[in-house]
Amino acid sequence: MMTRSNLIIVINLLFLNSYADFPAKIPMEKPTQKVSPAVERLYDEWNPHEDRENELYSNFKYSQINGFERSKTISRRDPSKIILIDGVYHVWYTCRKTAGVPAGKNATENIPSFDWDLCDIWHATSSDGWHWIEDPEPAVTRLAKPNYGWRSISTTDILIWKNKYYLYYQGFNEIPGIHSGDRAAVTVAEAESPYGPWKPLGEVVVDFGKEGEWDSNAIHDPNPIIYDGKIYLYYKGSPQKGGKGGTLIRAQGVAIAENPLGPFVKSDLNPIINSGHETCMFPWKKGVAAIV
């Protein structure tokens, strides 16, 4: 016969079992005890392994390379894919070599606003990936006004198509960050060899979206790959307000072409990725993978 004291003990045990402390070792099965909404989402919408069970999951570390001097008036950033051609590694990147340091809104015709202002596209080579030799002159130099990208060109990436080489990069026709944010769209240069000479098109190949659309103010970080026999050029886009008034801050889209010089047609599914600051895509199995 159950007494009142026995009933109280049973209820207390049930209570304790229902509200036991969550263990340090994450259970592979969803706990039966009451858990927070965040833990519920871990099991219902994600998984307790997080990314560690993804076959692409990895770690990396920074390592020092040689061949690039350091200076307050020199900026190197936004490296392209590194490609290996006839035993030589090639990389292209944004490079600013100016008389002064970036001055923000005090920028002038000769003083940059930011690290990506008054830049050209530079090229370096290496036999081992550790020791690099920078070319004495830019691979692609800004064209004269009013050609596209006369103020600055940056964030390049390389495409090899039918034995020719194509560098896609964003071009600025105004001082970055002064009037309308980092307003830049994508243009391209072509060459017969990775050593150049490079011939800039001087025109936009992937343009801004219409006013009010998600990519109306920025087409940044072009990342071309070949997929299904076509050129898939991924890019980062942002609207004119860039997060103000509830607008999207940034996302990633793709434009597709059968010719490196275009026309590029934006996907009807854009934006295809709603997070990530830079574009980094690569063919993977039967599709495409992204680092975001």
PLM ranges: what are they?
Residues L7-A24:
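Bacterial Sec-dependent signal peptides at the C-terminal "C-region" and cleavage site
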